[in-house]
Amino acid sequence: GTTCYCGKTIGIYWFGKYSCPTNRGYTGSCPYFLGICCYPVD
């Protein structure tokens, strides 16, 4: 995946999604260009 930032927190960018995949252990997210940024990086 592509990296992205929620403030200073690095995450993975999911294009076209508006919620994070539930099976990857993400603890947070923020809206990102045409999608969502989910962290922490797995």
Swiss-Prot record:
GO cellular component: extracellular region; nematocyst
UniProt GO molecular function: ion channel inhibitor activity; potassium channel regulator activity; sodium channel regulator activity; toxin activity
Keywords: Disulfide bond, Ion channel impairing toxin, Nematocyst, Neurotoxin, Potassium channel impairing toxin, Secreted, Toxin, Voltage-gated potassium channel impairing toxin, Voltage-gated sodium channel impairing toxin
Keyword Disulfide bond among record annotations: yes
Free-text comment on this protein's domains from its UniProt entry: Has the CSbeta/beta fold, which comprises anti-parallel beta-sheets stabilized by three or four disulfide bonds.
Family (UniProt): Belongs to the sea anemone type 3 (BDS) potassium channel toxin family.
Protein name: Kappa-actitoxin-Ael2e
Lineage, top ranks: Eukaryota, Metazoa, Cnidaria, Anthozoa, Hexacorallia
